[in-house]
Curated annotation (Swiss-Prot):
This is Small ribosomal subunit protein uS2. HAMAP family: Ribosomal_uS2_B (MF_00291_B). CDD domains: RPS2. It comes from Streptococcus sanguinis (strain SK36). Belongs to the universal ribosomal protein uS2 family. One of its GO terms (biological process) is translation. The keyword Iron-sulfur does not apply. It comes from the Bacteria. InterPro entries: Ribosomal_uS2, Ribosomal_uS2_bac/mit/plastid, Ribosomal_uS2_CS, Ribosomal_uS2_flav_dom_sf. The gene is rpsB. Keywords: Ribonucleoprotein, Ribosomal protein. GO terms for cellular component: cytosolic small ribosomal subunit. One of its GO terms (molecular function) is structural constituent of ribosome.
Length: 260
C-alpha cells in the first residue's frame, strides 16, 4: 500500500506545477499534462517516488543517520521545523548561511556562541551585567537562534538532507553534493532534478502539499528509528513535551514580569 494516496495528493494540490513558460525541460517525464498554462504533475509517479523516498528515509534513520530538513521559504518554514522536531531531527527554515556544511567548523563556533549566551542567562551572569549589554546579548542570541537554532544540537554534518524546493535551496544542495550527502527533495516543474538523489515530483509552493510530503518523510524517520507502530506513540510523547514547554514559558514570563 502506498504511503500517500492519490486522494491525499489531490486534496493537498500536489499536482499543480508552475506556469509552462517557467518549466525545466528535464522535468518533462514527471509531467502529466498542461492546463490553462500550468503544468500538471503526474501523481501516479508522485505516489511511486514518494514510496521510494519514504523507504530511503526510513532505512537511513534505522542506521542512525543524522537527517537535516531544509526549507527556508515561508510556505515551508513551519512544516520543516515541526516535522524535523517531531522526528527528533534537525532543520534550517530561515536563510541558508553559505558554508553551513562546507565550513562546518566556523558554523560550530557560532553554535558554541549561542550556547554560551544561553548559559550566561541560566547561570545568573545576565543579572550582574549592564542592561545595555544584556540587550545586545539577547539580540545576538535571537539572530543566532533564528539561523542556527535548528542545528544547535546536531552532532555532526548530516548523513541525509531533505529539501523543500531545491531550486530555491541551490546553495544547500551544492554543499551537500560537494560533501557526498544524499539529497531527498520535493521537486517542482521549474527545477533541475539532476542534483537530487531521491526525487519526489510535487508542488513545492502550496503549504498543504509541503506539509503532507514533509510529514510523511518525518513518519519514515520515526518508523526507521523505532519501528512501524511507533509513529502515534511518538506524536503523543511530543504533544506532552510541548505542553510542558508551554508551562515553562509561562513561568519565564511571570519571572520576567516581576523584574520590570
Amino acid at each position: 500500500m502506498a504511503v500517500i494516496s492519490m486522494k491525499q495528493l489531490l486534496e493537498a494540490g500536489v499536482h499543480f506545477g508552475h506556469q509552462t513558460r517557467r518549466w525545466n525541460p528535464k522535468m518533462a517525464k514527471y509531467i502529466f499534462t498542461e492546463r490553462n498554462g500550468i503544468h500538471v504533475i503526474d501523481l501516479q509517479q508522485t505516489v511511486k517516488y514518494a514510496d521510494q523516498a519514504y523507504d530511503f528515509m526510513r532505512d537511513a534513520a534505522a542506521n542512525d543517520a543524522v537527517i537535516l530538513f531544509v526549507g527556508t521559504k515561508k510556505q515551508a518554514a513551519d512544516a520543516v521545523k515541526e516535522e524535523a522536531e517531531r522526528s527528533g531531527q534537525y532543520f534550517i527554515n530561515h536563510r541558508w548561511l553559505g558554508g553551513t556544511l562546507t565550513n562546518w567548523s566556523t558554523i560550530q563556533k557560532r553554535v558554541a556562541r549561542l550556547k554560551e549566551i544561553k548559559r550566561m542567562e541560566e547561570d545568573g551572569t545576565f543579572e550582574v551585567l549592564p542592561k545595555k549589554e544584556v540587550a545586545l546579548l539577547n539580540k545576538q542570541r535571537a539572530r543566532l537562534e533564528k539561523f542556527l537554532g535548528g542545528i544547535e544540537d546536531m552532532p555532526r554534518i548530516p548523513d541525509v538532507m531533505y529539501v523543500v524546493d531545491p531550486h530555491k535551496e541551490q546553495i544547500a544542495v551544492k554543499e551537500a553534493k560537494k560533501l557526498g550527502i544524499p539529497v531527498v527533495a520535493m521537486v517542482d516543474t521549474n527545477t533541475d532534478p539532476d542534483d537530487i538523489d531521491v526525487i519526489i515530483p510535487a508542488n513545492d509552493d502550496a503549504i498543504r502539499a509541503v506539509k503532507l510530503i514533509t510529514a510523511k518523510m518525518a513518519d519514515a524517520v520515526i518508523e526507521g528509528r523505532q519501528g512501524e507502530d511507533s509513529v502515534e506513540s511518538v506524536e503523543a510523547e511530543l504533544a506532552a513535551t510541548e505542553t510542558q514547554a508551554d508551562s515553562i514559558e509561562e513561568i519565564v514570563e511571570v519571572v520576567e514580569g516581576s523584574n520590570e
